[in-house]
Amino acid sequence: MSQLQTRFFTDNKKYSVDDVPFSIPAASEVQELSNVINKLLEAKNGSRSQIEFDFLVQGQFLRTSLSNHMEAEGISTEDVVEIEYVERFTAPQPEECMMHDDWISSVEADSEWILTGSYDKTAKIWSLEGKAVMTVAGHTDVVKDVAWVKRDGLTSLLLTASLDQTILLWEWNSERNKLKARHCCRGHAGSVDTIATDPTRTKFCSGSWDKMLKIWSAVATEEEEEEEEPPSRPRKKQKTEQLGLTRTPLMTLSGHNEAVSSVLWLDSEEICSASWDHTIRLWDAETGSVKTSLTGSKVFNHISYSPLCRRLASGSTDRHVRLWDPRSKDGSLVLLSLTSHSGWVTAVKWAPSHEHQLVSGSLDNLVKLWDTRSCKAPLYDVSAHEDKVLCVDWTDSRLMLSGGADNKLYTYRYTACETDAGA
């Protein structure tokens, strides 16, 4: 078929065209369609424009000719083809580069500050402009994960988790730039590799090489708690005096058969964890019982949850990013696989304000930006790092971040959410 009957539509009122059928060549690709829309806009508005657009047919981005796409997707050419168009997403633009003295294991940023953890045994607080504001030194071994707890005016609470089997709860005053360790959380019998603060900002959960998850209070108090010695393995001897008052867990969640690699809260009552035992588990935060188990075929390195699309993204040792419905009754059903990395996927993070987009980092040195409506290839490869990518983040203020084995943390500005949200 040489011609197709099409109808174009968009959510962005600024670029809307008349809702009537058009006859266009079946061999048209993205550039030709973009030219068509620009000509229609010129005729409608009287102003010449050259906007780059992307096109979706039945919810999937067009990456080939219309006829090839429709044949591959099994779409009838007899009916009028509904084609959605959006302004093309621009590539993430590198902004700042920050350095640690060793690998950067973790990053969590918000609208004001960036928090990083490193194999140099420290965490650091940075301004969004890349200025080192505070070095958080207190662990005797590698810092594996970091998390903000809450901000109350000029005072912030933050967490650092370490290979030294402890988690430190810190209080930082940004005006005076003073830092104090409030609590040393003890109870794990292995490296603490992952931490996550709950939505109420009063508790946090940790996951460890010892296969356990533990829930702790995130409220700073003046009380010392009696430490319980791990029954199975003796704790490492302390080389230095402990920072902060001892804190013990509120609850231990036992069920994984290998190391816990990633943990998050779906809401204030549900915890989700990923493990080297090839499972992702949902836990009841009140009772500590397992509610659901999702089974994969490889080690899980990292997970991220989007409340917008209610999907879980996972990164594994077989180079695939996979999407799951965490509340599915069929615990092994993968909704979508995103395949482009050539190494282990070490980190994944959903866009906080875009239900279709996520970012991934890998041992192949690349950060990839994905849109789930274009699952055959990423939107962009970001190749800033010279070594393994170990962590990624994406903030509400549309800042993307990545850290890696080149000791560097990069920030990138990405504005897709603005152009895709409508006028």
Swiss-Prot record:
The UniProt record lists the keyword Nucleus: yes
Region (Ubiquitin-like (UBL) domain): 4-87
Cysteines joined through disulfide linkages: none
Location in or out of the cell: Nucleus, Nucleolus; Nucleus, Nucleoplasm
Keywords: Nucleus, Repeat, Ribosome biogenesis, rRNA processing, WD repeat
GO biological process terms on file: maturation of 5.8S rRNA from tricistronic rRNA transcript (SSU-rRNA, 5.8S rRNA, LSU-rRNA); maturation of LSU-rRNA from tricistronic rRNA transcript (SSU-rRNA, 5.8S rRNA, LSU-rRNA); regulation of cell cycle
Start and end residues of each stretch annotated as Disordered: 221-244
SMART domains in the cross-refs: WD40
GO cellular component, one term: PeBoW complex
Molecular function as annotated in GO: ribonucleoprotein complex binding
Family in the record: Belongs to the WD repeat WDR12/YTM1 family.
Function of the protein: Component of the PeBoW complex, which is required for maturation of 28S and 5.8S ribosomal RNAs and formation of the 60S ribosome.
PANTHER family named among the record's database cross-references: RIBOSOME BIOGENESIS PROTEIN WDR12, WD40 REPEAT PROTEIN 12, 37
Subunit structure, interactors included: Component of the PeBoW complex, composed of bop1, pes1 and wdr12. The complex is held together by bop1, which interacts with pes1 via its N-terminal domain and with wdr12 via a high-affinity interaction between the seven-bladed beta-propeller domains of the 2 proteins. The PeBoW complex associates with the 66S pre-ribosome. Interacts (via UBL domain) with mdn1 (via VWFA/MIDAS domain).
Annotated protein name in UniProt: Ribosome biogenesis protein wdr12
Species this chain originates from: Salmo salar (Atlantic salmon)
Organism lineage string: Eukaryota, Metazoa, Chordata, Craniata, Vertebrata
Designated gene of the protein: wdr12
